């Protein structure tokens, strides 16, 4: 494949791995390399990445702010679905990969590149997510996955390669785990976390304080929804990215959104991950409670049956699949009346609902009251119960 490659677009973070990959691509394939970095809320300045990429041999560098697109077109659709993988994981990394891939492919087209490359290892989910997205957009694109080709399979070897080729290397000691951050969450895995019995050290966490160290006074938060999407916090209208950032700030202050789980990777193995998702945790609780007030029972139950499949598709990298499009269209049709406000309380790692209200509410006090009412004839319940018990009574008679 090497002789056929003239130009490659690399998903570039500026870290040791992708800096080595950039130089390795130039040397191994004798090609031009375009470095692409996406700002999806990592919480760090990306402009220095430009100089590092150029120093490592990049012929061009793209640094794109994708935060609003990430939240509006990837996070919010998933939260309209209440998506959660294996009952615990809010899909922070999974949702970012298709956006990065899409923009990477757009740059490849702009640059006339014939290949794309990424820094995902051959053991993880990200290689699948990146490459399924690439191929869904352009089946003819060539893909270079260095971790499946080279023998630089340790940090020591990467450092030696970097020093040999004059690549800027980290001056700080490597952390005993890997992390990945965006506006929705930060994940930690590997290293000391590979032992599922070993608790994470408190100094690892960056988006949230320890619940024990959180304020002793609870804080109320009001979230407004329109058609399933959050649009305001405490009465202030905010853009999607700014709204999620605000909820991250509030949730992190109160120690909300920490999760330590063992999950099933698409490639077949189990892995342990520790996550901080403060804003996402608040948002999911609020959205689900907004739905309880405004969504028809049978629609809600049918939609809920689709959540595991939706989450599995996102987790496994099928964001651009036809079945994903079908599910999203179906789910979005359920959100038309999910409008109103939810009041929550944040306190020492907990997020609980205090109240909810909506002009689209299906909750009627005159029907639900335990006091005397004139709109519900309680005697009607007798026939309802008798008809619904018919098959049970027949079964009982057969067993005698």
Swiss-Prot record:
It is found in: Cytoplasm. It catalyses: L-citrulline + L-aspartate + ATP = 2-(N(omega)-L-arginino)succinate + AMP + diphosphate + H(+). PROSITE patterns: ARGININOSUCCIN_SYN_1, ARGININOSUCCIN_SYN_2. L-citrulline binds at residues 89, 94, 125, 129, 178, 187, 263, 275. InterPro entries: Arginosuc_syn_C, Arginosuc_syn_N, Arginosuc_synth, Arginosuc_synth_CS, Arginosuc_synth_type_1_subfam, AS_cat/multimer_dom_body, Rossmann-like_a/b/a_fold. Its EC number is 6.3.4.5. Keywords: Amino-acid biosynthesis, Arginine biosynthesis, ATP-binding, Cytoplasm, Ligase, Nucleotide-binding. Pathway: Amino-acid biosynthesis; L-arginine biosynthesis; L-arginine from L-ornithine and carbamoyl phosphate: step 2/3. CDD domains: ASS. ATP binds at residues 11-19, 38, 119. One of its GO terms (molecular function) is ATP binding. One of its GO terms (biological process) is L-arginine biosynthetic process. HAMAP family: Arg_succ_synth_type1. Belongs to the argininosuccinate synthase family. Type 1 subfamily. Homotetramer. NCBIfam families: argG, PRK00509.1. This is Argininosuccinate synthase. It comes from Desulfatibacillum aliphaticivorans. The lineage of its organism: Bacteria, Pseudomonadati, Thermodesulfobacteriota, Desulfobacteria, Desulfobacterales. The gene is argG.
